[in-house]
Amino acid sequence: LSKGWEWVNSNQISCPLYWNYNNKGTIKEFTLHGLYSLIGDAPVCHISYYEASAYAKWADSRLPTEEESEIFLKTINSKNKNLNSSKSIYHASDINLSVNNLWWWTKSHYSSYPGFKPFHEEIEEYNEKFMCGQFVLKGGSVATPSEHIRNTYRNFYEPHQRWMFSGIRLARDVQ
């Protein structure tokens, strides 16, 4: 997390992207529907891997692995066949809506799945250049086509990026 702390300090990060403080101390969030007051139980959106990881540590939790996330998604999808069609604004009390309204960071580094082989050699170079210094995000977002969302669908970004509807899901080890 030392790189994260350096990033926070050098970029003067004090809150998630698109949050705005007014002179009365009120926090508003710029959303797809304009500027709104924060919704207390809504998931935090537009955070970096560094912010997600630091919050998880503060909450005595951790970020899930990609594998744990896929198991979670498989379980949720088996219970709700219409999960992929959910595109409303997120609300924390409805797990089905919170699954694919935000990508969530995992602690897994982006690499190819075991046994993956590209269709063409030209694509191999394209794939490999993205597999350095990036982390996997799972779920999907309000901007993800519903046809793309599945248990194994993944996204990947560098740890400082936070523009892409990124959020957090916490995990804890079973004692």
Give names to the regions the model predicted.
Residues L1-N151:
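Functional-site microenvironments in short loops/helix caps that host divalent-cation chemistry
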Residues E125-K129, N155-R162:
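Short proline/glycine-enriched turn/loop segments at secondary-structure junctions
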Residues Y153, Y157, R172-Q175:
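Sequence-pattern detector for short linear motifs
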Residues R162-Q175:
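Short, structured beta-strand segments at or near domain termini in extracellular proteins/domains
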